[in-house]
Amino acid sequence: MTDFPVAETLDCGNAPLFVFVDHASNAVPESFDDLGLPKDVLGTHIGWDIGAAALGRNLSKRLKAKALFCRFSRLLIDPNRSLDKPDLIPFEADRIPIPGNQDLTAADRHQR
């Protein structure tokens, strides 16, 4: 994943707060083959928070704050979870199995 942009930053000022948009994108690195999901499924709310990136940008601008946007799908790995949580890499989302997340080894999880 070294050639994959994992984050985007925005610097709109020095307000004493920080905007973090953890589910800003539904992107999956090519090497993960869309986790075995059709593109239209990745484009739904299970792959990301639709509109969250635009909202984060607008908030950052209005509040004159710095912002950080995650540029990968929460289905790849959820940046809003602790490393020890079982749902860090979800097996399913809204009862839809995620084929690329089934039967992962400890090494697979560590790679992400």
Indicate residue ranges for each PLM-predicted region.
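N-terminal catalytic or cofactor-binding beta/alpha core of small enzyme domains
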Residues: 1-112
